Structures are given as C-alpha cells and as structure tokens.
Regions:
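Central antiparallel beta-sheet cores of small beta-barrel/beta-sandwich binding domains
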Residues: 1-77, 85-103
Length: 103
C-alpha cells in the first residue's frame, strides 16, 4: 500500500483556504482514510474505488455534501512528501500544496 501514514497539505480555492491532515491506513487490506480540517465539520465520505500505480494513488469517492457526484483524488508519494490534486464537482481540479508526512 502506498502513502501509509499521516500527511498534511494546503488547499486554496475561492470558497476555502486552509490546511488539513489525512491519515492513510491499512483497513484489513483496503485503504482507510481519516480527514481532519481544523474548524471545519468534515462531511461523510464513502470511498468507491482506489487504484494504486507505482507510487501514485487515485481514489474516487462521494460525499454527503454532493451525494450524487464523484470526487477524485490523486496523489504521488515520495518518502516524506506528496503532490496531487482533488477534482471537485463544479470547481474542477484543486491542487494539494506543500504535501508532507507528519507522522
């Protein structure tokens, strides 16, 4: 599994600017994610699909905020850093900035 650990990054859009953390873990052979954004109630998230390709992970998910729309996340992990984006309905691709391992 790629990207196991706790990571932080920044996101800047016209609706939200800030930092968050995501814990990526092995949930009995499938990917598990816990997302924390200080000061924000994180909506319910359902992971529909995860594809691993080398050091990249691509995930498709849905959220209670837009229940009939797919979100996509792609991240490429190095030892202690990552780059990537989240594709949000209506907004398009939003870059994940300053991705780094914190635990």
């Amino acid at each position: 599994m790629v990207g196991i650990g706790t990571w932080s990054c920044r996101v800047d859009t016209m609706f939200f600017s800030g930092s968050g953390t995501v814990k990526v873990f092995d949930d009995n052979g499938k990917y598990g994610f816990n997302l924390d954004i200080p000061g924000v109630k994180v909506p319910d998230i359902e992971i529909k699909e995860v594809i691993e390709n080398g050091n990249k992970v691509h995930a498709v998910l849905t959220s209670s905020v837009m229940p009939n729309k797919d979100f996509e996340i792609e991240a490429e992990f190095e030892e202690n850093t990552f780059t990537g984006y989240i594709k949000v309905p209506i907004l398009g691709k939003v870059k994940l900035k300053d991705g780094k391992r914190i635990a």
